[in-house]
């Protein structure tokens, strides 16, 4: 039996379907952002944006969660949340591309090109895989466009990475508890929380895990990802075998040619 169909399996927030559905609840997203930004975010000040961006030649970027947040009735922030479970060789470039693409989309919609004023673009990645960073002990890294003196070019473009493996280093107790929901969990031994937000998040995740339709959707999505990963692995192995065979063949040809040349010289 596939473990995803086992009723004892608890889907945590690393699973794409559960991550998306959790943060598509404006109360849960508002609570999370309020803690992370240390400022009040109201659920009613959050609207959700299109998660697709069409590229040239008809290709698309599919984002996990995209929301527009209004702070203090004046500041507009476009938030893109992504869960990254698998190591990606070009993860840095991928994050930058996602964020810049969303920034570009907003620029295209701007009405006054003489004095462009768009909301800030903020990309937040939850990273549960290996990630190259100068300080791997951080729980959070912040990236901005700066010059060699550290002067910020624009405050409307930012990329942050949360390193889940270092969640215990987070000084915000509410988030430190919440991040435990982004790790492998035992349904019969779920962590107990002392903070209000983590308790509410746990309760919602329990309800989501009792949703049979959501479990089926998550299972289908995970099977697709596994099949895709298996195809990539097979392609790499076949490419490696082909490369080795070709290398051996070329080596034999070269060896014969060199041996023949040496024989003629002698």
Question: Which sequence ranges carry the predicted segments?
Answer:
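Elongated, amphipathic alpha-helical interaction scaffolds
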Residues: 1-266
């Amino acid at each position: 039996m596939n473990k995803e169909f086992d009723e004892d399996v608890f889907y945590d927030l690393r699973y794409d379907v559960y991550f998306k559905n959790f943060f598509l609840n404006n109360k849960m997203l508002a609570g999370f952002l309020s803690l992370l930004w240390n400022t009040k975010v109201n659920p009613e000040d959050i609207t959700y944006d299109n998660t697709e961006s069409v590229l040239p030649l008809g290709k698309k970027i599919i984002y996990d969660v995209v929301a527009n947040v209004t702070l203090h009735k004046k500041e507009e922030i476009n938030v893109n949340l992504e869960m990254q479970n698998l190591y990606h060789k070009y993860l840095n470039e991928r994050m930058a591309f996602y964020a810049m693409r969303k920034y570009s989309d907003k620029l295209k919609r701007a009405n006054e090109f003489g004095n462009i004023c768009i909301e800030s673009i903020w990309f937040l990645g939850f990273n549960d895989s290996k990630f190259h960073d100068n300080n791997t002990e951080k729980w959070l890294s912040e990236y901005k466009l700066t010059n060699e003196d550290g002067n910020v070019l624009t405050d409307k473009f930012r990329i942050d990475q949360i390193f889940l493996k270092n969640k215990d280093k987070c000084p915000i107790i509410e988030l430190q508890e919440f991040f435990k929901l982004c790790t492998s969990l035992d349904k019969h031994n779920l962590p107990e929380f002392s903070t209000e937000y983590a308790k509410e998040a746990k309760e919602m995740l329990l309800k989501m895990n009792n949703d049979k339709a959501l479990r089926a959707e998550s299972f289908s999505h995970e099977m697709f990802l596994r099949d895709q990963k298996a195809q990539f692995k097979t392609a790499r192995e076949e490419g490696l075998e082909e490369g080795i065979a070709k290398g051996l063949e070329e080596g034999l040809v070269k060896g014969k040619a060199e041996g023949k040349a040496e024989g003629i010289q002698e």
